[in-house]
C-alpha cells in the first residue's frame, strides 16, 4: 500500500503521527506511511483535532474536508482530503 493515493479527486494519506513534537511538519516516508509530526499531545482528541487543522492549512481546504477514516485512537491513521486545493511539495513528489 502506498503512503499517498489520489482516488477520484480525493487524496488518501496513510500517516504515522508523532505527537508532542517540537514543531508541526511533514517529515517524510516512514516505511509505507507518511510521517507527520505535530505539537499537540495525544490526550482527549487534541492530537486528532490539531492534525486536522494542520492538514487543512497545508492543503488549503476547510477542516470539514479532512476526514480521519481509520486510526482515531492510534498513531497509524488513514486520512481523506476531499478535494485538495494545494498539494505540498513533499507529498506531490510521492504522487509521481
Curated annotation (Swiss-Prot):
Q: Which GO terms describe its cellular component?
A: cytoplasm
Q: Which organism does this record belong to?
A: Shewanella sp. (strain ANA-3)
Checking NCBIfam families in the record gives:
DUF167 family protein (TIGR00251), PRK05090.1 (NF003466)
InterPro entries linked to this entry: DUF167 (IPR003746), YggU-like_sf (IPR036591)
User: What family does the database annotate?
Assistant: Belongs to the UPF0235 family.
SMART domains xrefs: DUF167
Stated name of the protein: UPF0235 protein Shewana3_1191
UniProt xrefs under HAMAP family: UPF0235 (MF_00634)
Amino acid at each position: 500500500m502506498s503512503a499517498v493515493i489520489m482516488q477520484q479527486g480525493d487524496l488518501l494519506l496513510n500517516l504515522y503521527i508523532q505527537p508532542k513534537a517540537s514543531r508541526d511538519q511533514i517529515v517524510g516516508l516512514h516505511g509505507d506511511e507518511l510521517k507527520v509530526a505535530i505539537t499537540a499531545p495525544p490526550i482527549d482528541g487534541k492530537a486528532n483535532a490539531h492534525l486536522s487543522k494542520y492538514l487543512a492549512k497545508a492543503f488549503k481546504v476547510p477542516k470539514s474536508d479532512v476526514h480521519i477514516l481509520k486510526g482515531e485512537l492510534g498513531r497509524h491513521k488513514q486520512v481523506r482530503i476531499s478535494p485538495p486545493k494545494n498539494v505540498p511539495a513533499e507529498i506531490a513528489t510521492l504522487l509521481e
